[in-house]
Amino acid sequence: MSFLKALSFAAVLLVCAGHAVAQITIPAASAIQLAGGKLNLNGADLQISGTLSVGPGLVTNANNISIAAGGLLDAGSGAINLSGNWSDLGSFIAGTSLVNFIDGGSAQAIFAGATTFYTASFSSTTGKNYLFPVGLTQTFTNSLTILGTAAQGIQFRSTAAGQAAFVNLQPSGTQNINFVGVSNVHATGQPLAPTQTNDGGTGDAVGWFGLLAVAVAAVPAPLLSPFGLLLLGLLLMGLARKFRSLSTRCLA
């Protein structure tokens, strides 16, 4: 039996025995290939310290997914569905994959690290909060979908109020965005949701909703030569004398 089959079989046994599977780990130095198959995590966390190659396969019903330092998640042309946190402290190869961030479990999901996705979708009917790390950029090269509802907008926030996180939909990418609130998350690539309004966010949404960053350049004062400074001084002295003269006449 392969390592993946043994791992999945053990998970099934635990579920059938009435025990929740908290986490499935791919150890360091282990390499797993789905080869078009499906890994159903049944709400468990996935910890990747070795290598997981999805290929055209499917990773589904994950809670948290964590790529540890030294770990590799090669998404290939497959799909990954998760409802919890996303941590990328190792390597993520997006390929032409789709990563779906969905409702379930916690009311918020926290990102760690900076990831480049090919296609990513964030959808929530519960107003879920997605928290992105301050100072880091999540990049989307092909397509970005962000969908809340009219009743409860999905929320994009940074992990620290008043400090910005960044998202970058590259120029060739497409977007489908509706009912999203943004707080301290800047769009540094394509302007995002330019015809929408901030649905429940606190602001600092540069690059969203038609709010563009405006660069204000400092204009240095012109430098004067010594002769120019002398003339300026004489002019000021003349103005001062004229002012005193007018003041004396008015008092008289």
Go through the PLM ranges and name each one.
Residues F9-A10, A20:
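Cleavable N-terminal signal peptides
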Residues V21-T137, T145-A215:
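Extracellular beta-strand-rich, repetitive "passenger/adhesive" scaffolds
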Residues L212-L230:
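Short, threonine-centered small-residue motifs that mark membrane-proximal processing/anchoring sites
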